[in-house]
Each structure stands twice: as structure tokens, then as C-alpha cells.
């Protein structure tokens, strides 16, 4: 065990899958910034060949604003030299055997050199196609494990999952691995992952034999994923396939040290490499921005429920610290919840109040340049009440519009069809988000708390400063949301 993280990273060769993803970028940037003497970073990306992989890494990772601090510290020439010497682009795909690394010489070299394998690759769409979700989140995780076992120097597999693999359980969610043989739904049906794959393949075969369009196949595979997830007690395909991935890792790890990081909702950087950096709208961010744009009038949420968020740089710090602690540890199978609900909770109601104050003071502009005035949102605490509200507020008036369209088809075009599609989209999104906005669980994080305390003690003793902080108690939610996160969304996502 070594909790001097900077020293631990020195001369290490690390494979990172899903390297163009939000969390992976922050993880890679942190390593290069604090330990330029890392030996090598093999970064796996989906690409047709090495040239395409290198181009993706350059445009989607290293040219991003995230790397501006490193670029300022080193200058363009030295940074480019560092990337040339330390980073190896690897075209591949974890959904395929050997991670899709077709270059046998590269594959053999990697298996001789790699010390740490970090699996961040995932599809995070809640209603992903079942074949895609199983391919990446479930059996892709197993492919990464099998590749790691072939690495002769490997000290650890660190797998990034999600805290929401717990499903919709209320109360204190335990920080422990899944035991596949213990997984049964409320009717006693035991989960069989291989059977799930066979069911998926059979459905896909039937659809192809029927000459279904790609659109119909996609819709059918999405429906199958949601159907199987709910049958076994999970709310959606994403968390179901991620949980099965964890189960396969636990069952087949043998003696390989395994650490599973389960972050909650990942948000913008708290402090490193600079505050507020984020890519895309993530979970609760979509709601915040919709509110700022004045288009959110009502929303399904229990304002007293905790919204478990954690800044992305804290997740990266926890990953590095956990790797340093457990690398080379015999028989290790550790789970870390990285979130805030247990030690420093913030509710949806509190977030709304902060958003009201922010957008009242800093209003967005509409397309015509006028300032957007926000008002408080009508929050509806149950799905039944939300459906009733939508029926009375929108669906009944829509029936009148349908009648007008039928009687006077030349006057309105298909206004009914257009508005009905929008309402159906809203209801679909609400159904997907329901498990999270009404979530009643709190994530036990005693493992993470202990890891964080040990790391703080080690850092203060040796360096007198914190370089790998991931203590959620240090987050001031009012300051973070107002001055860092929401302003970061406006700057980096809306480009205002």
C-alpha cells in the first residue's frame, strides 16, 4: 500500500479505456500535471486505425480548455513533447475480444508493460439499446478484465461504475460488491447474465429476419433493455447493464486486485485544474439550464430529496488514491461510493433556490437578445400527480386542437401532431429521470471516508498541502453552485 500518490504514479504504465470521456479526460490531465514522470499512458479510443485514434485524442482531449493550465505551465512545445513521449493512442473497442486492438505487436507490448488498468468506458444512455448496453457496460467490462489478466505486470484493475447500480432502494445503500448468486427480483427470479445475452441475440436475430428498419430495430432493442431491467428490479438499461458488469468482474477476477469506484452524479470541477470546467449537460444540469432559459414551468421532483452530486476532480482524485492504496494487494475487491449525500447533503429544493437567485441576478438572453425572466417552478412530488397535471394542463386542450385540425386541416397544418410529439417526449424524459429525482437512498461511504482521511494525513505529513482531496464535507454548495457550477455551465456548455 502506498498513499503518496505522486510517488505511486512515477514510472507507472497505465491503460485508460474510454479516454475521450468527461471523467477520463480529467483523470489523464491530473496525472500528467502532477506526475510528468509517469512512464506511459495507453489511451484506448474507438477509432478505425492509429491515425484516427491519435486525431480523436488531439481534438477531443488535449486541445480542450481543460489542458490550458498544463499548457500555460509547460508551454506548447514542452507539452507536445510530453504528450509525444508519454501518451500512446490505441484504437480499439472494449465491446470486442482483445479490446479490439488489432495490432498484435502493440497488444503484446501493452501486455508486457501495463501496471494499472483503468476502465472508464461506458455508455450512459438511460434507455440504451440492450445489445449496445450489454456489449459495453456488461461484457465490455469482462473483456477489460480478461485483457488485464494477460498483462504480466498488472497490479490492479480499477473499474468506474455508478452509485445507482443499487436500483431504487431507499435508506442507506451499502458500500459493498454484488454477489451474483444472491441477485433475485421480488418474485424470486434469479438473474442469469448469459441468459440475458442469449435473449438479446435471439430478439436481434428475429428483427433482422423480419427485415426491420434500423430505426425499428433500435426502438425494439431499447424497449427490450428497459423491459429486462424492470423485470429484475432496476429502473433502466444503463444501471442494469452496469450492475451486471460489476457482477462479472467480481465472479471472474480470480487473484487480480479489483477496485470499483461508484460515483454519484458527476458535476463540474471544484478546483482543478480550474473551477467550473464541464462538458455537456449532465443529469441535473439539463434541468438547471432549462430553468434558466425560462422553459421549465413544472417538474417531477421531491424537493426534500437529496441530490447526490460530486465534482469530477474529486472523483479523479479518489480514483488515483484508491489505485495507490490497493495496487498489488492480494485478493482485493473494494468498492468506493464517491458522493456527497452521506456527509454533506444538498436537496433539490435548495438547488432550485440557488438557481432562482443565480438566474435572477444573471439572466440569460433569448434568441432575440431580450433578457429572460425566471419564476419559481411548480414541483410535483409523485408520478401520478405529474401525469394528472399534464393531462389537465396540456392533453385535454390538445384534444380540442386535434378537433380543429380535423375540421379545418388547411388552417393549422399539423399543430396537434407537433405538440403531441413534444408532450410524449416530455413524458418519456420524466419517466427516465423519475428514479433519480424521487430517489430516497443515501450512499454509505465509510470506505471512501477512511481512504480520504488516510490520504489527508499522508499528504499533510509529507507535503503540507492537499493535492488529492475528495472530501465532500469541504464543498460549500451555495458557493459552488452559484460561483462555479452554474456559471461553468453557462460558460462552457452554453458558450455565453
UniProtKB/Swiss-Prot annotation:
The UniProt-reported impact of residue 347 to I is: Decreases protein stability and enzymatic activity
Superkingdom to which the source organism belongs: Eukaryota
* UniProt effect for mutating residue 238 to F: Loss of enzymatic activity
**Result of changing residue 242 to I:** Loss of enzymatic activity
Which body tissues produce this protein?
A: Expressed in the endodermal cell layer surrounding the central vasculature in roots. Expressed in floral organs of very young unopened buds and receptacle of siliques.
Q: Give the reaction(s) catalysed.
A: a long-chain fatty acyl-CoA + 2 NADPH + 2 H(+) = a long-chain primary fatty alcohol + 2 NADP(+) + CoA
Do the record's keywords include Oxidoreductase?
A: yes
- Gene Ontology biological-process annotations: lipid metabolic process; response to salt stress; response to wounding; suberin biosynthetic process
Q: What induces it?
A: Induced by wounding and salt stress.
Reported effect of changing residue 363 to S?
Decreases protein stability and enzymatic activity
E.C. numbers: 1.2.1.84
Does Secreted appear among the keywords?
Answer: no
Give UniProt keywords alphabetically: Lipid biosynthesis, Lipid metabolism, NADP, Oxidoreductase
Q: What is the effect of changing residue 355 to L?
A: Catalyzes the formation of C16:0 fatty alcohol instead of C18:0
Extract the InterPro entries matched here: FAR, FAR_C, Far_NAD-bd, NAD(P)-bd_dom_sf
GO molecular function terms listed in the Swiss-Prot or TrEMBL record: alcohol-forming long-chain fatty acyl-CoA reductase activity; alcohol-forming very long-chain fatty acyl-CoA reductase activity; long-chain-fatty-acyl-CoA reductase activity
What's the stated role of this polypeptide? Catalyzes the reduction of fatty acyl-CoA to fatty alcohols. Catalyzes specifically the formation of C18:0 fatty alcohol. Provides the fatty alcohols required for synthesis of suberin in roots, seed coat and wound-induced leaf tissue. Provides the fatty alcohols required for synthesis of alkyl hydroxycinnamates in root waxes.
Q: Which family does it belong to?
A: Belongs to the fatty acyl-CoA reductase family.
Q: What is this protein called?
A: Probable fatty acyl-CoA reductase 5
Q: Which organism is it from?
A: Arabidopsis thaliana
Q: What is the lineage of its organism?
A: Eukaryota, Viridiplantae, Streptophyta, Embryophyta, Tracheophyta
Amino acid at each position: 500500500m502506498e498513499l503518496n500518490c505522486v510517488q505511486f504514479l512515477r514510472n507507472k504504465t497505465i491503460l485508460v479505456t474510454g479516454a475521450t470521456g468527461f471523467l477520463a479526460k480529467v483523470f489523464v490531465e491530473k496525472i500528467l500535471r502532477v506526475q510528468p514522470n509517469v512512464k506511459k499512458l495507453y489511451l484506448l479510443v474507438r477509432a478505425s486505425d492509429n491515425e484516427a485514434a491519435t486525431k480523436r485524442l488531439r481534438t477531443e482531449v488535449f486541445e480542450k480548455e481543460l489542458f490550458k493550465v498544463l499548457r500555460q505551465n509547460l508551454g506548447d512545445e514542452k507539452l507536445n513533447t510530453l504528450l509525444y513521449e508519454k501518451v500512446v493512442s490505441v484504437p480499439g473497442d472494449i465491446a470486442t475480444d482483445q479490446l479490439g486492438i488489432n495490432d498484435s505487436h502493440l497488444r503484446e507490448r501493452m501486455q508486457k508493460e501495463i501496471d494499472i488498468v483503468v476502465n472508464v468506458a461506458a455508455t450512459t444512455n438511460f434507455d440504451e439499446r440492450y445489445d449496445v448496453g450489454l456489449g459495453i457496460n456488461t461484457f465490455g467490462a469482462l473483456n477489460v478484465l480478461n485483457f488485464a489478466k494477460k498483462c504480466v505486470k498488472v497490479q490492479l484493475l480499477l473499474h468506474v461504475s455508478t452509485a445507482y447500480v443499487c436500483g431504487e432502494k431507499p435508506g442507506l445503500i451499502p458500500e459493498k460488491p454484488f454477489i451474483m448468486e444472491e441477485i433475485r427480483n421480488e418474485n424470486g427470479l434469479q438473474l442469469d447474465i448469459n441468459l440475458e445475452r442469449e435473449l438479446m441475440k435471439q430478439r436481434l436475430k428475429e428483427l433482422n429476419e423480419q427485415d426491420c428498419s434500423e430505426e425499428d430495430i433500435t426502438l425494439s432493442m431499447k424497449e427490450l433493455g428497459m423491459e429486462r431491467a424492470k423485470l429484475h428490479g432496476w429502473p433502466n438499461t444503463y444501471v442494469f447493464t452496469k450492475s451486471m458488469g460489476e457482477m462479472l468482474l467480481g465472479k471472474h477476477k480470480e487473484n487480480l486486485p479489483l477496485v470499483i469506484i461508484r460515483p454519484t452524479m458527476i458535476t463540474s470541477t471544484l478546483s482543478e485544474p480550474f473551477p467550473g470546467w464541464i462538458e455537456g449537460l449532465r443529469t441535473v444540469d439539463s434541468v438547471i439550464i432549462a430553468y434558466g432559459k425560462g422553459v421549465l414551468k413544472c417538474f417531477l421532483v421531491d424537493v426534500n430529496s437529496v441530490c447526490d452530486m460530486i465534482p469530477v476532480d474529486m472523483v479523479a482524485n479518489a480514483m488515483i488514491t484508491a489505485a495507490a492504496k490497493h495496487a498489488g494487494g492480494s485478493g482485493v475487491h473494494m468498492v468506493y461510493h464517491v458522493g456527497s449525500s452521506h456527509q454533506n447533503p444538498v436537496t433539490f429544493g435548495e438547488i432550485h433556490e440557488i438557481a432562482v437567485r443565480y438566474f435572477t441576478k444573471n439572466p440569460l438572453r433569448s434568441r432575440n437578445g431580450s433578457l429572460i425572466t425566471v419564476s419559481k417552478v411548480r414541483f410535483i412530488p409523485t408520478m401520478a400527480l405529474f401525469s394528472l397535471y399534464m393531462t389537465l394542463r396540456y392533453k385535454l386542450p390538445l384534444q380540442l386542437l386535434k378537433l380543429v385540425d380535423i375540421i379545418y386541416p388547411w388552417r393549422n397544418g399539423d399543430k396537434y401532431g407537433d405538440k403531441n410529439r413534444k408532450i410524449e417526449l416530455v413524458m418519456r424524459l420524466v419517466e427516465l429521470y423519475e428514479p433519480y429525482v424521487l430517489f430516497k437512498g443515501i450512499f454509505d461511504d465509510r470506505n471512501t471516508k477512511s481512504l480520504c482521511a488516510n490520504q489527508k494525513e499522508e499528504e499533510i505529513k509529507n507535503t503540507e498541502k492537499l493535492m488529492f482531496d475528495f472530501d465532500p464535507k469541504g464543498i460549500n454548495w451555495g458557493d459552488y453552485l452559484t460561483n462555479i457550477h452554474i456559471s461553468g455551465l453557462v460558460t462552457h456548455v452554453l458558450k455565453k
